[in-house]
Amino acid sequence: MKKSILGVLKWIILLMLAIVMLVPFFWLISSSLKDKTQFYSNPPVYFPIPMHFENFVNAWVNIGFFRAILNSLVFALTFTIIVVFSSALAAYGFSRFKFPGKKVLFVILLLSMMLPTQIMTIPLFLMFKKLNMINTILPMLLPYCLGVPYHIFLIRQFMNIFLYGGAIRATPEALDEAAKIDGCGTMQIFFYIIGPMSTPTLIVSALLNFIWAWKDVWYSNIYLGRPERQTISVRLLSLIGDKSVEYGQMMAATVMMMLPVILLYFCAQKYFDEGITITELK
């Protein structure tokens, strides 16, 4: 009896949390179908009648949605590949090799996670301006070619604790020796053994990086001044005028902007959940 009551309470709490999390999405979709008068109506309109689907068409045309989506896709995919690959290599080096100053470097890496990236914005902007890289995606990619501290730490922890822990019941030396006997070099061990076995964590890292790049406004707004080069998150700002804001179009554009990320998550949900579970188990 006591267990059944606790079970019911658990589901009630989960249901309430789900409602709290879904309300913003409902309000976003509802707002994307409103006109200006419905936005300012009192009491608020939750189910707009009539529904103004023209907000989606107007947003698509006014902000150059197709070009902006392509820009975001190119930037997000390139950023994800660079960060995941470089972070995985750095994590492999920290977790597998012994070299002078290793612990000091790793402590510096952890300390750098505590610093806001915005403090380097002005020096980086001045440097990239002298290199004539403004209005390209290079300033948003080059600083991350050596890996992002958080993802280096995440992948390193996976390699150290899970990969060489209870998963394979073998020491790193034994695994490496077996691979070397088969003729594998250091990079071959990484690509053919460590990489595939770290797939769940790599996918989690890739998803987090893709989402960050997709929604980035700070760096995109600083380095991409030309409208034809701007990503979708920056183009949304063009709907904010000096005297008015096109709320309906902005909400409609936000809904369309979210769809690729939601689709990506559902396609990779299995690996994402597995990677999160592994991270928790460590």
Residues covered by each model-derived region:
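A structural signal for multi-pass alpha-helical bundles of membrane permease subunits
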Residues: 2-282
